[in-house]
Amino acid sequence: MPSSTSPDEEDGLETCVLKVFDLDLKESNLVNPSNSLKAELDGSTKKKYSFAKKKAFALLVKTKQVPAPSYEFKGKRWRCCQQLFADQISIHRHVATQHAEDVYQQTASLLKQLTAALSASQSLTPTDKRSSPKDCLTPSQEVSAWLPDVSHVSPQELRSGQGDEEGEVLLYYCYCDLEDPHWVCAWQTALCHHLHLTGKIRIATEGINGTVGGSKVATRLYVEVMLSCPLFKDYLSEDDFKSSKGGSHCFPELRVGVFEEIVPMGISPSQVSYKKPGIHLSPGEFHKEIEKLLSQSSEEQGNTIILDCRNFYESKIGRFQGCLAPDIRKFSYFPSYVDKNLDIFRQKRVLMYCTGGIRCERGSAYLRAKGVCKEVFQLKGGIHKYLEEFPDGFYKGKLFVFDERFALAYNSSVVSECSYCGAPWDQYKLCSTPQCRQLVLTCSACQGQGFTACCVTCQDKGGKQASGPSQDSFKEECECTARRPRIPQEQQAQS
């Protein structure tokens, strides 16, 4: 079972937070400005450090400000981390203590902007100086210049998806070359705070990968800004944003960071590029391929593999009929899985799929680079887009998502079972042992009997802790996870 507290998991997307997911921003390869930032600067840039830090702090505080009804409060107020602040001292203290990392990120970005602006001003000709900055987005432009006007929207409309009221969760990615991911990081942080969005966003020189939740008004504004941004407008379309019912309550907070990869496969983008993926198939084309495959004889079916690129706990509760679903815990294990099982792909047509399409981009590129497959295809838009078009198609079960919802249901089929009694069941809960907190499938009847852990060891451990003195919770890998083969050896191509 995947741990909810492991900082190295990626897929990826939180009182019961799944910190193993795609967009988890606390893993060790996060590139962040640190307290040593000033010491690393050259002499001329170091002089601007204090100004940049103050401005970064002020900009972040400004994004937290919310209008106050005149009949209720005359001064300014700020909202952050589901708290309301009525005076500057308290919001300043909160930002300084709880969002220091964001301040450092934006400070580093502002320093780059100041340096670039100074360099540009010294080299511009009079003709250059007359050029409009709106023609092209450059690092010298302030983050605040790319925040949408929300004066026509009430604070209630922006925050309506935070409680029981229905909001929306967006899932998207965009592979494109970004020269200054730190600028994009600062901008995305400010943009999401501005629109009261929560979620997780990964940024790298190879692009951006995000999932954000908020009110429908806020998510629509977010899409509009992304589609109008010069960095992404030539690559993104409205169809690239997958939406589902939810809101900002689906995530405990906002996490935005700069990484080497926008989805961690564990291989540098310079070695395996998103620019050489498998052939994209629309949901309709993918549906026809599977329909044709399932109508063939067993011998003919052996020439094609439907490959699930997700983790085992995702495919466990939902998958395409006849697929090969690797029993791996992380996408970063996928390259090793391919290497270990290369023979099953030899001279085969491979139809790959994942949640939204992002893992297939580089996953298919890696498989193609091996040079053993006859053809490699991938589902454009992933399962998400397929289910929008074919809710009762060849995908059976639920779609796992990396937030507090755990899964989305598009059809009534149940393909998984209770870990204890074997009854049909597909509703994940977290292991009841605090140190473990892995995902477990245990039906209502078994939960009523006290079976709430991922395995017998955890069940016993949880019982002893409940009867003993309280102690601080600390992360601990479960024995059932430790016993799992890291990279399974497949005996046959089809399941």
From Swiss-Prot:
UniProt-listed CDD domains: RHOD_YceA
Phosphoserine, modified sites: 268
Annotated Gene3D superfamilies: 3.30.70.100, Rhodanese-like domain (3.40.250.10)
Positions of the Rhodanese domain: 300-395
Keywords: Phosphoprotein
Record has Phosphoprotein as a keyword: yes
Active site: 354 (cysteine persulfide intermediate)
Keyword Magnesium listed: no
Family annotation (InterPro entries): Rhodanese-like_dom, Rhodanese-like_dom_sf, Rhodanese_C, TrhO, TRHO_N
Cross-referenced SMART domains: RHOD (SM00450)
Superkingdom of origin organism: Eukaryota
Matches recorded under PANTHER family: THIOSULFATE SULFURTRANSFERASE/RHODANESE-LIKE DOMAIN-CONTAINING PROTEIN 2, THIOSULFATE SULFURTRANSFERASE_RHODANESE-LIKE DOMAIN-CONTAINING PROTEIN 2
Protein name: Thiosulfate sulfurtransferase/rhodanese-like domain-containing protein 2
